[in-house]
Design a protein with these regions (language model features):
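Long, charge-rich, low-complexity alpha-helical segments
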Residues: 1-207, 216
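A generic secondary-structure signal for well-formed alpha-helical elements
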Residues: 140, 241, 245-248, 363, ...
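N-terminal amphipathic, basic helical "cap/leader" segment at the start of enzyme domains
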Residues: 145-321
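Conserved hydrophobic/aromatic beta-strand scaffold that supports enzyme active sites
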Residues: 285, 326, 395-397
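Short, electropositive alpha-helical surface patch
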Residues: 381-395
């Protein structure tokens, strides 16, 4: 195991620590000054084998002294808030009760951490595995048994944990890692592509309904036999649900207020729209920018579109060729995880429910066919270049029923 001081501190110190069974022994045998530096979050620790760095611990910004980590318990478990992502230096594990992260610089480390996150049986029978667990412990990513509130697993989160964090992109287990720009305060997720399609704002009631009438009229309609909807209708349902009304940046986070209630204004929900036969949008996938209220079109082949439309047909009975549009709710787990620990998934499902009801009210007012779905249990992978891979935790289809016309016709 190697201890290092980052060069931005002023000078680099590399000290080989021989004979230490764990990184926690730094405070007892590494010297008083070294221990002080470690408490300040200045030192990083690497797992090195045959001159190759397998993983390294990157301390986050610390405003107070950092106490030595508590020993992790066995069986070894990652905290519910732990997740994998692409950071500035590649795959990394983050999301504990600190801003620390462990950069996974080898395929072995990625696969080991992915098994840990998937709650698979992790066998610790070699020095590298023990040292990697020490790194994860230093970063505050393992269950220690001391903080029951943040380490407790809710039943639903335990059941769906793998769905929100894991895919088959990396090895046998694989972490769901999106190639996103990393920021320590987890800002609102926005599309990466520059191309945008602006969506309008029209808060006027199309049918002149009162709120009570819209509540009474809403229902799950499975008829897309009318003239195709377009960006105006898609804009209306997104405007009433996911569009961000106000952003507020603080030292620790970026809070976003929407028209629906969200936990601490830290919702990790975003959306991908699949336009199957919209009259003014090309067939394809579009990532929604909730800040600017725009759609960012994907490019390249999108083989997953037909799979999603096939799922919608099986769940709703609407013919595959008649489906006009779908909305996929995507969870950016990292954004709320720092504050909500084990209840992130439950909180996100409540937010999906609120968004679906807002969409249902707008659809009733506009005479649209709106049908929430369930059972996708998939990701946005394969929807085209520019669409980041994320866990889909809710879906709905949107169209115009037979016997109705577009507004203005």
């Amino acid at each position: 195991m190697t201890v290092r001081m980052p060069p931005e501190v002023g000078r680099e110190i590399v000290a080989a620590v021989g004979g230490l069974s764990s990184a926690r022994e730094l405070t007892s045998r590494g010297g008083e000054e070294l221990a002080k530096l470690d408490a300040r979050g200045v030192l990083g620790v690497e797992v090195v084998r045959e001159q190759h760095v397998l993983a390294r611990h990157e301390p986050g910004t610390r405003r107070v002294r950092h106490s030595p980590p508590s020993p992790y318990v066995r069986p070894v478990r990652a905290l519910p808030s732990a997740h994998m992502r692409f950071g500035p230096d590649g795959p990394e594990l983050a999301g504990g009760n600190s801003a620390d992260r462990v950069v996974l610089t080898s395929t072995w480390a990625v696969e080991f951490a992915a098994r840990l996150i998937a709650r698979a049986d992790v066998e610790v029978d070699s020095a590298p595995e023990s040292e990697l667990l020490d790194l994860l412990s230093r970063a505050g990513l393992l269950v220690t048994g001391r903080n029951q509130h943040s380490e407790e697993w809710e039943f639903h989160d335990s059941l769906f944990h793998g769905a929100t964090r894991l895919d088959t992109s990396f090895g046998l287990y694989g972490a769901k890692i999106g190639t996103t720009h990393w920021e320590i305060d987890n800002p609102v997720r926005r599309p990466m592509t520059a191309e945008r399609i602006a969506l309008g704002h029209d808060d006027r009631s199309q049918e002149g309904m009162t709120l009570q009438e819209a509540i009474s009229a809403r229902s799950s309609l499975r008829d897309h036999g009318g003239p195709p909807i377009g960006s105006a209708e898609i804009s209306a349902v997104l405007d009433a649900s996911l569009r961000i009304r106000r952003l507020e940046r603080t030292v620790a986070s970026e809070r976003a207020w929407r028209s629906m209630p969200t936990g601490g204004a830290l919702s990790g929900l975003s959306a991908v729209v699949i336009a199957a036969s919209a009259h003014d949008l090309e067939r394809g996938a579009y990532e929604y920018d909730a800040v600017s209220h725009e759609l960012a079109p994907a490019s390249g082949p999108a083989p997953a579109i037909d799979r999603w439309l096939g799922l919608a047909h099986r769940l709703t009975g609407i013919p595959h060729t008649s489906i006009q549009a779908m909305v996929l709710f995507v969870l950016d787990y990292a954004r709320p995880a720092r504050s909500y620990d084990s209840i992130v998934y439950a909180t996100a499902l409540k937010e999906v429910g609120a968004a679906l009801q807002a969409m249902a009210l707008v659809s009733a007012d506009r005479g649209l066919s709106f049908c929430p779905m369930g059972g996708g249990f998939a990701t946005t992978a394969g929807l085209g270049e520019g669409i980041r891979t994320g866990a889909v935790i809710g879906e709905a289809v949107l169209g115009r029923p037979k016997g109705t016309e577009r507004a203005g016709e």
